[in-house]
Design a protein with these regions (language model features):
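Solvent-exposed alpha-helices and their adjacent loops that cap or buttress functional pockets
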Residues: 20-21, 36-38, 60, 90, ...
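Short acidic-hydrophobic, aromatic-tinged amphipathic segments that line or gate anion-handling sites
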Residues: 43-49, 121-125, 156
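Internal nucleotide-binding/catalytic subdomain
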Residues: 152, 156-293
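A conserved helix-loop-beta module that forms one wall/lid of the active-site cleft
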Residues: 90-152
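Active-site "cap" helix and flanking loop/linker of ATP-utilizing ligase/carboxylase catalytic domains
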Residues: 246-268, 285-359, 370
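Generic C-terminus detector
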Residues: 367-372, 376-424
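ATP-binding N-terminal substructure of ATP-dependent carboxylate-amine bond-forming enzymes
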Residues: 1-94
């Protein structure tokens, strides 16, 4: 069969790599792809938001199955467009992708269906938000309602910071229309864990847990980013936590969406906070995380096409989802200055060192070919250096070893990815 993957980051590289392992797939296309994906798929110069062009391409090239990696096209309704054209597409429809597309919607859903989450209020008026904050308890969390590349969450320790946050989100519109509505949420403490799942509208199958590192700097300092590294599984995601989440969060979310007339098909990413009062939902994403996909998919034993087709066909209950009993760590190599301002176009060397090593992998995020055919930096997050091992500590040591194999000017990384492993 022919498969089209839509997106251009490390997550899509991980998806393409999993698809390439499927015995059912003869040909992979990726739109728009990147320099690393080009080794596995034919990259097509169509942007992820160019729905009409993507649908035409899929029809003209007799694509059997399309996989959407990114949040923007899902929230924008790309799956609806593919379905209208009679094409099979993996991901939630627009009316279900709102689970990620609107934080206010997801908070209201959790409240209505008693899914554990932080106390909150939604605001569409900056003055009302400021009035509410006058009497609020600090620290407090402000969230832009819409998509903001994982950067629309502000933790405010004082009223002054909160006022500045309201200005940033609602008045200056730093995150554009994403800030038309703002969620004000109680600040929760505990460990953050990500859990990925496959969903077919009624059945949910949990993949594995992972742990992200969102801040740009060592010691969780600096600005929020799309993610500077990850490890899977999380040692803090115990059987007890799993039992609680299965009982009160996972199926409850799928059932809630179905009851609302918004059946969810695709991947639900649960961002959880393990608090003293038990696990609570921080956020939902309607797709694989990045770099969560890079640490979870290499551990999956199943043929990804079998699983994704079962989601689309509503037969996920027949799939026995299996994962290797191992660990995986990803360290992101970024451009110095990310997530604010950085230079691009630097030549990257050292890829050949990964050749023939099954337990090491270099996922490309912000890369492209220059006019001379060299691979150069083309984004804030450039590469995801990933390694598997029998234990988290082994995988971490191997991933950091491999970060030295690749060189480019302005290379930046965190040196404490997986530090929490030592505290487990």
């Amino acid at each position: 069969m022919k498969v089209l993957v839509v997106g251009s980051g490390g997550r899509e590289h991980a998806i393409c790599r999993a698809v390439a392992k499927s015995s059912r797939v003869d040909k992979i296309y990726c739109a728009p792809g990147n320099a690393g994906i080009a080794a596995l798929a034919e990259c097509v110069p169509i942007g992820a938001m160019e729905f009409d062009k993507l649908v035409s391409f899929a029809k003209d090239n007799a694509i059997d199955f399309t996989i959407i990696g990114m949040d923007d096209p899902l929230v924008g309704g790309i799956v609806d467009e593919f379905e209208k054209a009679g094409l099979k597409c993996f991901g939630p429809r627009k009316n279900a992708a709102i689970l990620e597309g609107s934080k206010a919607f997801s908070k209201d859903l959790m409240k209505k269906y008693n899914i554990p989450t932080a106390a909150y209020e939604n605001f569409t008026d900056a003055k009302e938000a400021l009035k509410y904050l006058e009497t609020a308890k600090f620290p407090i969390v402000l969230k832009a309602d819409g998509l903001a590349l994982g950067k629309g969450v502000l933790i405010c320790n004082t009223l002054e910071e909160a006022k500045e946050g309201v200005r940033t989100i609602m008045e200056d519109k730093k995150f554009g229309t994403a800030g038309n509505t703002m969620v004000v949420e109680e600040f929760m403490t505990g460990r953050e864990v990500s859990v990925l799942s496959f969903v077919d509208g009624k059945t949910i199958k949990i993949m594995s847990s992972a742990q992200d590192h969102k801040r740009a700097g060592d010691g969780d300092t600096g600005l929020n980013t799309g993610g500077m590294g990850n490890f899977s599984p999380s040692p803090f995601y115990t059987d007890e936590v799993d039992d609680f989440c299965k009982k009160y969060i996972y199926q409850a979310t799928v059932d809630a969406m179905a009851k609302e007339g918004r059946p969810f098909t695709g991947v639900i990413f649960f961002g959880l906070m393990l608090t003293e009062d038990g696990p609570k939902v921080l956020e939902y994403n309607a797709r694989f995380g990045d770099p969560e996909a890079q640490v979870v998919l290499p551990r999956m034993k199943n043929d990804i096409i079998d699983v994704m087709e079962a989601c689309v066909d509503g037969t996920l209950d027949t799939i026995d989802l299996q994962f290797e009993d191992n660990a995986c760590v990803c360290v992101v190599l970024a451009s110095d200055g990310y997530p604010v301002k950085y230079e691009k176009g630097f030549k990257i060397t050292g890829f050949e060192k990964f050749d023939g090593k099954d337990d090491y992998y270099c996922y490309h995020a912000g890369t492209k070919f220059d006019a001379d055919g060299n691979i150069v930096t083309n984004g804030g997050r450039v590469l995801g250096i990933t390694a598997t091992g029998a234990t988290l500590k082994e995988a971490r040591a191997k991933a950091y070893e491999a970060t030295e194999w690749v060189q480019f000017d302005n290379k930046y990384m965190r040196h404490d990815i997986g530090k929490a492993i030592d505290e487990a």
